[in-house]
């Protein structure tokens, strides 16, 4: 009989994809289990179906969660655990705990609202009722289970485990989690911020570890490293170019951190009279509440330059849904709305009313996951489908990639080098395959003897002091089809252009033959 390793790690999310972060650490036979993060899968509808499927673990086995930060792809399944009867605790930094109150309650409202909208759609008539993944009440229950701990101080998340949180430089309250158990020393990066990021100090961490689990979101990208002043120059140019067209500048934003960074830069430009004095609308109740948390932790932030982002005369925080809808009738404004990947939230109705307007501009300032509506728009789709409606894309589409909260390839590599020696394995997670492979190739070139693991969803690895990780179970083959390109977005794009394509076929008989040919293909595919 093969001896059971003293510690194992199972990847329930963010393996070969950038969302759904969730790692389960289990001590040997009869030992305790903990999770590092428990996040929501985001992006395409196909990928999001994983949130409703099997968790891959029994919540009753989990003694605690160590949470790296408050982004939904790292904490968004915690309310589902609460709905299943789990009670905590959730260990995190104080700013993260403060943010969870709003992040998870909002996530619950989104789940409830999304279920209501789906059940009302005409194309679901006769289908089984769609139930929300969890509710606002479940989200608040998860927040109440938070147990804040200071950075750089050891604590015991569960019997047999010792942990310490290090600054990750990603967003307010973000941390990397150092964990010791069964003689194994492990560091989970969480999300690592870029060097010299606005608001946040640079990432830190220990060295001389058995295992390092490192994110690889931008493992295949190296950005030009620019100063905050240069970034503001770029934003100034985009704002001026958008407003001179006479339309709105619509910016899909992540409610947490990206909104606050943009506000600081916009206010700075306005105070210096570098941009026109137009109204700035933050149309996201969650972003408004997160901004108040930032203000409460202002003494922990850098680069504020005395700006109070929670109270500034040029910034209008939109709370009421009716006020949000009224923004569809205006022009010449800056509208910031969540969600950042355009998969939910008020940004969808702003896109619906502005994508079709040639005078409008949509400016992307954040990562767009494969399959997300934001990625589809960025890749040049002439039409998109939003809430069951076909929308032609006539607006000017722009992108600034200097606001990233993620380290690029060179910064990730530098962070990994600073953790040396890594005596067991470097484990690359939280990335799409191209990013993982590029970062792995770079690190392998620097150290040919380094064990590098690229886990798949559902895989379990045995961990032992000083030894390379050993795969114990293979990944979940039932979910591989959810990864990568999404058929539902292809369908939406196809449906949006179908009528136009048919209209270009000469003659009614020819169009009818084309329709019949499509029907035959569909019938044959069904077997």
Please provide the spans of the model-predicted regions.
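Active-site neighborhood of phospho(di)ester-bond hydrolases with catalytic His/Asp-centered motifs
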Residues: 37-38, 62-71, 78, 90-93, ...
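Core dinuclear metal-dependent hydrolase active-site scaffold
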Residues: 2-60, 141-201, 326-328, 334, ...
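Cap/insert and terminal regions of metallo-dependent hydrolase folds
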Residues: 172, 176, 195-282, 361-363, ...
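Short, conserved secondary-structure transition motifs
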Residues: 257-258, 280-295, 460-462
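C-terminal regulatory/interaction regions
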Residues: 268-271, 315-527
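Short active-site oxyanion
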Residues: 63-64, 87-89, 248, 278-279, ...
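Metallo-beta-lactamase
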Residues: 107-171, 298-330
